[in-house]
Design a protein with these regions (language model features):
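Conserved catalytic/acceptor-binding region of the Class I
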Residues: 115, 119-190
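A short beta-strand submotif of the Rossmann-like class I SAM-dependent methyltransferase core
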Residues: 98-99, 107
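A short acidic, Gly/Pro-enriched loop at the edge of an enzyme's catalytic core
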Residues: 88-96
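Class I SAM-dependent methyltransferase SAM/SAH-binding core
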Residues: 31-33, 39-86
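Short conserved AdoMet
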Residues: 26, 47-51, 106, 119
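A short, conserved alpha-helix within the catalytic core of class I
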Residues: 105-114
């Protein structure tokens, strides 16, 4: 799946993400469950500072990319192919992390399972955001993307939100989740070529080449390149990246 291969073009999470997650584990076992781990950014970023990680994802393609990292061979990591609702777990966990994955889960099944798997007093942390924040081209890009979806699907998307709009709302709202805090990381500057920026876009489900098909992917890239060239310097785009982290306790019922 090309979507998984394009994940390497996403910006890294800020260091503040990892320090925050480690703070949340301070009084608990240094064992994490990375739920919907994708290509393993959270697990691989924490593994030198924890005792063990179970990293679960439904996509074999994502896990293949994760396992290709040199750090992925650590005996402290168990890569598990399966759904978080049914995958074999090895609790208790000092922290469960769902990084840009909670929206894919059946929460009525998953949250009670998390409650059972967490050590006493341990937290669930959910993350959102590894995309440009307040980029100079955001207005043009957004208008194009909304029109592109409307042309593809026959109607304008009612789910569309900018990163700022998403940051203003909780990532997870569910009766079984008791939010205890949140943090929006400080912005950090990231640069990449237009070609790599487009590959990053193709790592997102709405814009994946598997979703769009070959013809629409070429059209998408051509229009986006026209927009982005106006903002690039020597072919490079520079933008800020931020992440919203929120954490809380999970009840079984």
């Amino acid at each position: 799946m090309r979507m998984a291969e394009n994940y390497r073009f996403r910006p890294p999470y800020p260091t503040e993400v990892y320090t925050t997650l480690l703070e949340l584990m301070r009084e608990h076992p240094r064992i994490i469950l990375d739920a919907g781990c994708g290509t393993g950014k959270i697990t691989l970023g924490l593994i030198d500072h924890i005792d063990r990680a179970d990293a679960v994802d439904t996509s074999d393609a994502m896990l293949r990319v994760a396992r290709a990292s040199p750090a992925a061979a650590s005996s402290k990591i168990r890569w598990i192919h399966g759904s978080i609702e049914d995958a074999p777990l090895d609790p208790p966990y000092g922290l469960i992390v769902a990084a840009s994955s909670i929206h894919w889960m059946d929460l009525d099944r998953t949250l009670p399972r998390f409650a059972d798997a967490l050590a006493e007093g341990a937290m669930l942390a959910v993350l959102d955001g590894d995309a440009p924040v307040d980029a100079p081209w955001e207005r043009e890009e957004t208008a194009f993307m909304i029109d592109f979806i409307a042309a593809q699907e026959g109607q304008r998307p009612n789910w569309w939100k900018t990163i700022r709009e998403r940051f203003a709302e909780p990532v997870l709202m569910h009766p079984l989740f008791e939010r205890r805090g949140h943090r929006i990381t400080a912005p950090f500057s990231f640069s990449q070529s237009i070609a790599d920026y487009l590959r990053c876009q193709h790592s997102r489900s709405a814009w994946s080449e598997d979703q769009l098909g070959a013809k629409a992917s070429v059209e998408f890239d051509a229009e986006m390149t026209t927009i982005l060239k106006r903002y690039a310097r020597d072919g490079m785009l520079t933008f800020d990246v931020q992440t919203r982290i929120e954490w809380g306790r999970v009840r079984r019922s």
